[in-house]
């Protein structure tokens, strides 16, 4: 049997040489879809419904809901609850995120369930005595947690757009928590690498994820009895159990005992918000993504508007000229991000100006295909924050054509590492996504301005970008990714790879990626690009830095006949796309 790693190399080499494997050329699919690990350049295929997520067990939960007659929203909520059990690195009840929904009728809406700063939060709460940001406070203390939004967001989506009752879609997650599941490679590796930094510091957490003084290993069974009880209460009593009931008591008491800020009043006051998506037109395709407090949608559309002024297809995938143009466009977008983006309920975000094609043309006119502009010479445009890599994204499409893209997170891996009392629920460290000191880069190098300063009841800025692309009025691509500041450029490349270069969803997923975020002034690249191309980029003035893999897209493409083509990212272990 040919090893998957060899197939990956073949696929990447083929992409770099200009070869293109079309979805139509794929061999006949077996009755049940298979994981992309088995074949990296042919998508998974299905006719009725499809789920792509970072965890195989959660994916199967979603497929089962679809088979039982649930729609894409029902399946998405079920997957979200399942990931809170099987992928505690980022799947959560104690965090937040965004959901993008496109109905079979063509209506598109966004659900914002981003965490909110507690009412007692203050602008300078994460500064030390010298006025400098203290990352321990904003990452690992009880002060680091914002009021969670996941449970409220899932219920808002399910009540308005789903067809199944809450207890039905929570049931699979409850069983997984109660009965346990086998720890896979991904969870075992993350417990050892990242969990060891935060989980053993808290007895509640250690009792769940540690055994005999060590983190659980691959093959161990992880049972989460307290989390099962919390899920059972949510299933029976709805989101009020989390925000006003026993679970709220557990969270508030955990905070009160340990110097945190979240109160019962903060929890009771939390509301998920339905917002109008950001949208733009790119070469005849309509691109929908998240509005603020996500910066993702605005800047994906902004960069696409800039690229529309160039013949990207002519330059070709992986060429120095194409990468130069995209990197320069990204610099301008990230510079604007630092200045203008924040919670739209608190600051006026000039999204219409930022996504205006005339503004994009003015930026395109400044891009020199032969010479990189130093970031120090770029300032936010004249118009008429730290994010973790351990977010998770999943995509769902059902038999009727409803589509859902969800990106949610605890922020860093396992969040604060703190489990609230006996709830079994890990708490986020999302407060670190605010600009603790405007103008000072966070751990990811992202610079934030006053618009994203800490404030009571405010939602921190995010790059999470669940995205749906429409062709001829029909859903064409559902995608998204984790990756912190690199989410925007990862999703951008999925769109450009698919539209401009004609890659199928598996090829677009497997193609090597690159990223520029203005500051630091470096062009970050994955392995897989031609050394000659990188030398040409350096000759153009780019500061090329070879770094580890970025992103983990989970994507579904819809063919003209309605057939579904999906791909999970081989950069992640144990993810799965499946359908029926």
Swiss-Prot record:
<protein>
    <recommendedName>
        <fullName>Glutathione hydrolase proenzyme</fullName>
        <ecNumber>3.4.19.13</ecNumber>
        <ecNumber>2.3.2.2</ecNumber>
    </recommendedName>
</protein>
<feature type="binding site">
    <location>
        <position position="433"/>
    </location>
    <ligand>
        <name>L-glutamate</name>
    </ligand>
</feature>
<keyword id="KW-0732">Signal</keyword>
<feature type="binding site">
    <location>
        <begin position="462"/>
        <end position="463"/>
    </location>
    <ligand>
        <name>L-glutamate</name>
    </ligand>
</feature>
<dbReference type="Pfam" id="PF01019">
    <property type="entry name" value="G_glu_transpept"/>
</dbReference>
<dbReference type="GO" id="GO:0006750">
    <property type="term" value="P:glutathione biosynthetic process"/>
</dbReference>
<dbReference type="InterPro" id="IPR043137">
    <property type="entry name" value="GGT_ssub"/>
</dbReference>
<feature type="binding site">
    <location>
        <position position="409"/>
    </location>
    <ligand>
        <name>L-glutamate</name>
    </ligand>
</feature>
<feature type="binding site">
    <location>
        <begin position="483"/>
        <end position="484"/>
    </location>
    <ligand>
        <name>L-glutamate</name>
    </ligand>
</feature>
<feature type="binding site">
    <location>
        <position position="411"/>
    </location>
    <ligand>
        <name>L-glutamate</name>
    </ligand>
</feature>
<comment type="function">
    <text>Cleaves the gamma-glutamyl bond of periplasmic glutathione (gamma-Glu-Cys-Gly), glutathione conjugates, and other gamma-glutamyl compounds. The metabolism of glutathione releases free glutamate and the dipeptide cysteinyl-glycine, which is hydrolyzed to cysteine and glycine by dipeptidases; it may function in amino acid uptake/salvage, or possibly in peptidoglycan linkage. Catalyzes the hydrolysis and transpeptidation of many gamma-glutamyl compounds (including some D-gamma-glutamyl substrates), with a preference for basic and aromatic amino acids as acceptors.</text>
</comment>
<keyword id="KW-0808">Transferase</keyword>
<comment type="similarity">
    <text>Belongs to the gamma-glutamyltransferase family.</text>
</comment>
<dbReference type="GO" id="GO:0103068">
    <property type="term" value="F:leukotriene C4 gamma-glutamyl transferase activity"/>
</dbReference>
<feature type="region of interest" description="Disordered">
    <location>
        <begin position="561"/>
        <end position="580"/>
    </location>
</feature>
<feature type="binding site">
    <location>
        <position position="430"/>
    </location>
    <ligand>
        <name>L-glutamate</name>
    </ligand>
</feature>
<keyword id="KW-0012">Acyltransferase</keyword>
<dbReference type="GO" id="GO:0006751">
    <property type="term" value="P:glutathione catabolic process"/>
</dbReference>
<dbReference type="InterPro" id="IPR055262">
    <property type="entry name" value="GGT_CS"/>
</dbReference>
<dbReference type="GO" id="GO:0043102">
    <property type="term" value="P:amino acid salvage"/>
</dbReference>
<feature type="active site" description="Nucleophile">
    <location>
        <position position="391"/>
    </location>
</feature>
<keyword id="KW-0574">Periplasm</keyword>
<feature type="signal peptide">
    <location>
        <begin position="1"/>
        <end position="25"/>
    </location>
</feature>
<dbReference type="InterPro" id="IPR000101">
    <property type="entry name" value="GGT_peptidase"/>
</dbReference>
<comment type="pathway">
    <text>Sulfur metabolism; glutathione metabolism.</text>
</comment>
<dbReference type="GO" id="GO:0097264">
    <property type="term" value="P:self proteolysis"/>
</dbReference>
<keyword id="KW-0865">Zymogen</keyword>
<dbReference type="InterPro" id="IPR051792">
    <property type="entry name" value="GGT_bact"/>
</dbReference>
<dbReference type="GO" id="GO:0036374">
    <property type="term" value="F:glutathione hydrolase activity"/>
</dbReference>
<dbReference type="GO" id="GO:0034722">
    <property type="term" value="F:gamma-glutamyl-peptidase activity"/>
</dbReference>
<keyword id="KW-0378">Hydrolase</keyword>
<dbReference type="GO" id="GO:0030288">
    <property type="term" value="C:outer membrane-bounded periplasmic space"/>
</dbReference>
<dbReference type="InterPro" id="IPR029055">
    <property type="entry name" value="Ntn_hydrolases_N"/>
</dbReference>
<dbReference type="InterPro" id="IPR043138">
    <property type="entry name" value="GGT_lsub_C"/>
</dbReference>
<comment type="subunit">
    <text>This enzyme consists of two polypeptide chains, which are synthesized in precursor form from a single polypeptide.</text>
</comment>
<keyword id="KW-0645">Protease</keyword>
<dbReference type="GO" id="GO:0042597">
    <property type="term" value="C:periplasmic space"/>
</dbReference>
<feature type="binding site">
    <location>
        <position position="114"/>
    </location>
    <ligand>
        <name>L-glutamate</name>
    </ligand>
</feature>
<keyword id="KW-0317">Glutathione biosynthesis</keyword>
């Amino acid at each position: 049997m040919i090893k998957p790693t060899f197939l990956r190399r073949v696929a990447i080499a083929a992409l770099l040489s200009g070869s293109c494997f079309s979805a139509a050329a794929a061999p006949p699919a077996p009755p049940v879809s298979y994981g992309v690990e088995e074949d990296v350049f042919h998508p998974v295929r299905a006719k009725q419904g499809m789920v792509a997520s970072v965890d195989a067990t959660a994916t199967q939960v979603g497929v089962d809901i679809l088979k039982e007659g649930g729609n894409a929203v029902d399946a998405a909520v079920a997957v979200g609850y399942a990931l809170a059990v099987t992928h505690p690195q980022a799947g959560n009840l104690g965090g937040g995120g965004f959901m993008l929904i496109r109905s079979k009728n063509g209506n598109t809406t966004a659900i914002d369930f981003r965490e909110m700063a507690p009412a007692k939060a203050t602008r300078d709460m994460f500064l030390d005595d010298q006025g400098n940001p203290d990352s321990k406070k904003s990452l690992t203390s009880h002060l680091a947690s914002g009021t969670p939004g996941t449970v409220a967001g899932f219920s808002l989506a399910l009540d308005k757009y789903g067809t199944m009752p809450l207890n039905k879609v929570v049931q699979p997650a409850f069983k997984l928590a109660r009965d346990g599941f086998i720890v896979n490679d991904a969870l075992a590796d993350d417990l050892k690498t990242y969990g060891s930094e935060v989980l053993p510091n808290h007895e509640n957490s250690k009792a769940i994820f540690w055994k005999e003084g060590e983190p659980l290993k691959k093959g161990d069974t992880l049972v989460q009895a307290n989390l099962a009880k919390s899920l059972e209460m949510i299933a029976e009593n709805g989101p009020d159990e989390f925000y006003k009931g026993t679970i709220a008591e557990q969270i508030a008491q955990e905070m009160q005992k340990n110097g945190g800020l979240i109160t019962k009043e903060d929890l009771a006051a939390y509301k998920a918000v339905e917002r109008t998506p950001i949208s733009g037109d790119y070469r005849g395709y309509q691109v929908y993504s998240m509005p603020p407090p996500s910066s993702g949608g605005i800047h994906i559309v902004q960069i696409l508007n800039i690229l529309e002024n160039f013949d990207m297809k002519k330059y070709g995938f992986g060429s120095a000229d194409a990468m130069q143009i995209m990197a320069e466009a990204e610099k301008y977008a990230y510079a604007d991000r630092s200045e203008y983006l924040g919670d739209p309920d608190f600051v006026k975000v000039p999204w219409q100006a930022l996504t205006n094609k005339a503004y994009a043309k003015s930026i395109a006119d400044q891009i020199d295909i032969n010479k990189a502009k130093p970031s120090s010479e770029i300032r936010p445009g004249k118009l008429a924050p730290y994010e973790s890599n351990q977010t998770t994204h999943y995509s769902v499409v059902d038999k009727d054509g409803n589509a859902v893209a969800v990106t949610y997170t605890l922020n860093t891996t396992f969040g604060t590492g703190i489990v609230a009392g006996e709830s079994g629920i890990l708490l986020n460290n999302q407060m670190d996504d605010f600009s603790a000191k405007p103008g000072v880069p966070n751990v990811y190098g992202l610079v934030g301005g006053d618009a994203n300063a800490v404030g009571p009841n405010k939602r921190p800025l995010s790059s999470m970008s669940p995205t749906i692309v429409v062709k001829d009025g029909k859903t064409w691509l559902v995608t998204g990714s984790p990756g912190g500041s690199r989410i925007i450029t990862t999703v951008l490349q999925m769109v450009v790879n698919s539209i401009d270069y004609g890659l199928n969803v598996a090829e677009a997923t497997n193609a090597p990626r690159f990223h520029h975020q203005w500051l630091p002034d470096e062009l970050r690249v994955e392995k897989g690009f031609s050394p000659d191309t990188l030398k040409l980029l350096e000759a153009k003035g780019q500061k090329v830095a070879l770094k580890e893999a970025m992103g983990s897209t989970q994507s579904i493409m819809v063919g003209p006949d309605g057939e579904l083509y999906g791909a999970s990212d081989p950069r992640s272990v144990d993810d799965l796309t499946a359908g029926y």
